């Protein structure tokens, strides 16, 4: 565990930021949508889309690109109605459509009250958005969809406000099947607890640690990164037994 803490500390928040912005195809999809959508609606759509990004029928990256292309240049009066048209035709997200539309209906009332300035306020205090979504959606604090939504909101806000704010340390890692599988090789502890400890000891918040692990699981192209960061990620790959 000490070696794991040291390598993540060596990568740091800045290294995680570089991975997010140069390797994560979801980040590229959001940059594309931002260029073709109103900034306020862009962020609201990203929140809504994150809340229905589960039980996919395709790869996550493909789903986010499908979303970005669909809403590019599209005028949206009601997010719920827009998804009522989008999801049934979607290639990468066709399961549990009614349940997903219900989730969007739940959050739309909240989103409709927010201005761009309000959204910027939530970016400055992402913990506040996390707590608000937990209450609105009736979810647990460590719900993987809720914490993933905060992560994608952070991406969207970073793009929209041209400013990087690190994720709060208190928000846990999204505990999906891949994270569970990787963690089980390292510890018997619950993944959210284990990575929270690693985060606190390394100084890198769990949502940023998630950004380091995911590309390694999916054999992402790391060539856009500088050689020093690539070497650190290769070392992390070894430590995770990938």
UniProtKB/Swiss-Prot annotation:
Q: Name one GO biological process term.
A: base-excision repair
Keyword flag Lyase: yes
Its UniProt domain note says: Contains two alpha-helical subdomains, with the 8-oxoguanine binding site located in a cleft at their interface. Contains a helix-hairpin-helix (HhH) structural motif and a Gly/Pro-rich sequence followed by a conserved Asp (HhH-GPD motif).
Q: What is this protein called?
A: N-glycosylase/DNA lyase
Higher taxonomy: Archaea, Methanobacteriati, Methanobacteriota, Thermococci, Thermococcales
Q: Where is this region: Helix-hairpin-helix?
A: 120-184
Residues at which 8-oxoguanine binds: 26, 53, 64, 148, 174, 210, 214
Family statement: Belongs to the archaeal N-glycosylase/DNA lyase (AGOG) family.
Question: Which keywords describe this protein according to UniProt?
Answer: DNA damage, DNA excision, DNA repair, Hydrolase, Lyase
Enzyme nomenclature, EC number: 3.2.2.-, 4.2.99.18
Key word DNA damage present? yes
A Pfam family this chain is assigned to = AGOG
Give the source species.
Pyrococcus furiosus (strain ATCC 43587 / DSM 3638 / JCM 8422 / Vc1)
Function in brief: DNA repair enzyme that is part of the base excision repair (BER) pathway; protects from oxidative damage by removing the major product of DNA oxidation, 8-oxoguanine (GO), from single- and double-stranded DNA substrates.
Q: Which domain of life is it from?
A: Archaea
The GO terms this record gives for MF are: class I DNA-(apurinic or apyrimidinic site) endonuclease activity; oxidized base lesion DNA N-glycosylase activity
- Catalytic residues at 144 (schiff-base intermediate with dna), 176
Catalysed reaction equations from the record: 2'-deoxyribonucleotide-(2'-deoxyribose 5'-phosphate)-2'-deoxyribonucleotide-DNA = a 3'-end 2'-deoxyribonucleotide-(2,3-dehydro-2,3-deoxyribose 5'-phosphate)-DNA + a 5'-end 5'-phospho-2'-deoxyribonucleoside-DNA + H(+)
């Amino acid at each position: 565990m000490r070696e794991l803490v040291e390598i993540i500390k060596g990568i740091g928040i800045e290294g995680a930021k570089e991975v997010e912005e140069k390797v994560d195809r979801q980040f590229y999809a959001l940059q594309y949508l931002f260029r073709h959508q109103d900034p306020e609606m862009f962020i609201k759509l990203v929140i809504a889309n994150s809340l229905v990004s589960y039980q996919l029928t395709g790869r996550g990256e493909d789903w986010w690109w499908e979303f970005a292309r669909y809403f590019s240049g599209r005028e949206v009066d009601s997010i719920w109605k827009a998804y009522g048209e989008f999801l049934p035709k979607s290639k990468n997200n066709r399961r549990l459509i009614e349940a997903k539309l219900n989730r969007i209906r739940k959050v739309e009332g909240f989103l409709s009250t927010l201005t761009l300035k309000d959204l910027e306020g939530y970016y400055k205090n992402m913990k506040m958005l996390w707590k608000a979504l937990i209450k609105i959606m009736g979810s647990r604090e460590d719900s993987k969809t809720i914490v993933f939504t905060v992560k994608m909101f952070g991406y969207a806000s970073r793009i929209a406000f041209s400013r990087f704010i690190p994720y709060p340390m208190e928000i846990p890692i999204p505990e999906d099947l891949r994270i569970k599988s990787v963690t089980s090789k390292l510890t018997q502890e619950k993944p959210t607890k284990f990575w929270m400890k690693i985060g606190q000891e390394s100084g890198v918040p769990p949502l940023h640690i998630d950004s380091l692990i995911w590309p390694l699981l999916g054999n992402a192209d790391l060539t856009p990164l500088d050689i020093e960061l690539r070497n650190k990620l290769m070392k992390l790959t070894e430590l995770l037994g990938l």
